[in-house]
Amino acid sequence: MAENADDDLNSNLLHAPYLTGDPQLDTAIGQWLRWDKNPKTKEQIENLLRNGMNKELRDRLCCRMTFGTAGLRSAMGAGFCYINDLTVIQSTQGMYKYLERCFSDFKQRGFVVGYDTRGQVTSSCSSQRLAKLTAAVLLAKDIPVYLFSRYVPTPFVPYAVQELKAVAGVMITASHNRKEDNGYKVYWETGAQITSPHDKEILKCIEECVEPWNDSWNDNLVDTSPLKKDPLQDICKKYMEDLKKICFYRDLNSKTTLKFVHTSFHGVGHDYVQLAFQVFGFKPPIPVPEQKDPDPDFSTVKCPNPEEGESVLELSLRLAEKENARIVLATDPDADRLAVAELQENGRWKVFTGNELAALFGWWMFDCWKKNKPNADVKNVYMLATTVSSKILKAIALKEGFHFEETLPGFKWIGSRIKDLLGNGKEVLFAFEESIGFLCGTSVLDKDGVSAAAVVAEMASFLDTRKVTLMEQLTKVYEIYGYHMSKTSYFLCYDPPTIKTIFERIRNFESPKEYPKFCGAFAILHVRDITTGYDSSQPNKKSVLPVSKNSQMITFTFQNGCVATLRTSGTEPKIKYYAEMCASPGQSDTTFLEEELKKLIDALIENFLEPSKNALVWRSV
């Protein structure tokens, strides 16, 4: 690593005892410098040590990543709490240890590894390299590994786990996070993301296996081991074949005059959405040329999250206007989520929220089910949503007679529940989370932007034959099942103690262990606190949803029918808020509903979050 005498001298000094005055930190520094074989991340720690930056060293080395709503996720760079070669090796060693304990047939069934297109030059860290290291750890232990030979959408990994009957799988991705981040998303043999107790047990195993094993760094195994297989062609073919299960109007699709623009946000989605459109009988969607190929810097967008709306969809919307395309489809960088925009008659674009799209998907999937299975029992049918998402599916279910269930935030809970329902002979048509995560059908047990894009195109084409737009159909859905006006946004907060203070203040609002009874002028009917397991609406005051002690989440039900939730993000330094006014069918004064919702959100922010006092950063896009 060192190339001259000065570097050799520095290197020798660095391998002397580390006297920072903090024994825990000294131990962690020693471990990092002994174990890390990536020259760039090793050098980052050496430079911090050389410059006496003990606080940053402590921040990087004295804590570990934990499983959030989407696996392990952090910035790329040096340190035990970051995503890098060493922490991915450690995580995979822990995975191996846990899976070996759980599955006697681990060596027969194998493990799936996929990756997106992220990368960071300064730490020599890319999703592809991290995927190879993940595979190498397992290959060194004689585990068959199905390693995709190129980048794939995240849904391909859970799909492959089920198809190949593997014991588990990992997708290296940070989805729509900022370019600095990456992640390690774990799927169980069911094809659903891991939930408790697996996540806690894997973390314990990781902590027991922190020192890299002899061959864990040997990524040459990926090229030489006969146990490595490439599932790309087989899985892509089967996935596309399975898409036909949720395609209902292929002939109509092939004749449509509608044009679609698709952006893959510099990620993995382009090729796969093109193939999905082909399966559905469509002409290919028009790609946004500047965004169709992978770019780990996400050069043309302020942030790689299509959920942010018009500000990040600029190139797609302008191309659509030029091409006379009425609908824009945007998959996020790992293609597990979907944003949709439609050109309105007034010449403006309507970017649908996740909740609005869910209303359309819910109507569409149930309508298609009814037409295709006229004699089937509606009581066997289910739809699901996370508890912070719109209650529109609940309203549709009440009127149509099928079942609706809620889960904790995060698609891992939805996937796990769907698996249970399928095991009991139930039929699940659709599930969603408000952050533009949709699942049509059950071929994949995670959100899927590729299939959702094709389904939206089919829905739009079908409606177009009846001279109805997506926006007009959304209005019809609300007129039939009741208007559901919702607003979701967030504040950035980079100081965990501040976040804790905000939520503890709510729990002890006017006196110890007393939740607020009012939010400004709005009377609170019930409070549910998932962090503590409290729910004032239940006879025993205990939440029906599982307790989630590692995250903050409080839901308020107001006298006026509004439901609002404050929670911390499981993947980013955000405090999110969600609020929805649910009107009865026939109540069509949308102006009143919107004004009431706005007033309540203002009161929620002012009384509970106190952004000025707590130095919270308002959403900027």
Curated annotation (Swiss-Prot):
Protein's cellular compartments: Cytoplasm, Cytosol
Residues annotated for Mg(2+) binding in this entry: S175, D332, D334, D336
Keyword presence, Isomerase: yes
Catalytic residue list: S175 (phosphoserine intermediate)
List of residues binding alpha-D-glucose 1,6-bisphosphate: R73, S175, D336, R337, E433, S435, K447
Tissue expression remark: Expressed at highest levels in the brain and testis, at intermediate levels in thymus, spleen, lung and skeletal muscle, and at lowest levels in kidney, liver and heart.
Gene Ontology CC annotations of this record: cytosol
Metal-binding in keyword set: yes
Root EC class: transferase
Catalytic activity, EC: 2.7.1.106
Keywords: Carbohydrate metabolism, Cytoplasm, Glucose metabolism, Isomerase, Magnesium, Metal-binding, Phosphoprotein, Transferase
Catalytic activity annotation: (2R)-3-phospho-glyceroyl phosphate + alpha-D-glucose 1-phosphate = alpha-D-glucose 1,6-bisphosphate + (2R)-3-phosphoglycerate + H(+); alpha-D-glucose 6-phosphate + (2R)-3-phospho-glyceroyl phosphate = alpha-D-glucose 1,6-bisphosphate + (2R)-3-phosphoglycerate + H(+); (2R)-3-phospho-glyceroyl phosphate + alpha-D-ribose 1-phosphate = alpha-D-ribose 1,5-bisphosphate + (2R)-3-phosphoglycerate + H(+); 2-deoxy-alpha-D-ribose 1-phosphate + (2R)-3-phospho-glyceroyl phosphate = 2-deoxy-alpha-D-ribose 1,5-bisphosphate + (2R)-3-phosphoglycerate + H(+)
Chief localization: cytoplasm
Molecular function as annotated in GO: glucose-1,6-bisphosphate synthase activity; intramolecular phosphotransferase activity; metal ion binding
Any GO BP annotation: glucose metabolic process
Phosphoserine PTM positions: S175
PANTHER family in UniProt: GLUCOSE 1,6-BISPHOSPHATE SYNTHASE (PTHR45745:SF2), PHOSPHOMANNOMUTASE 45A (PTHR45745)
Family as reported in the entry's similarity comment: Belongs to the phosphohexose mutase family.
Function, as annotated: Glucose 1,6-bisphosphate synthase using 1,3-bisphosphoglycerate as a phosphate donor and a series of 1-phosphate sugars, including glucose 1-phosphate, mannose 1-phosphate, ribose 1-phosphate and deoxyribose 1-phosphate, as acceptors. In vitro, also exhibits very low phosphopentomutase and phosphoglucomutase activity which are most probably not physiologically relevant.
Protein name, as recorded: Glucose 1,6-bisphosphate synthase
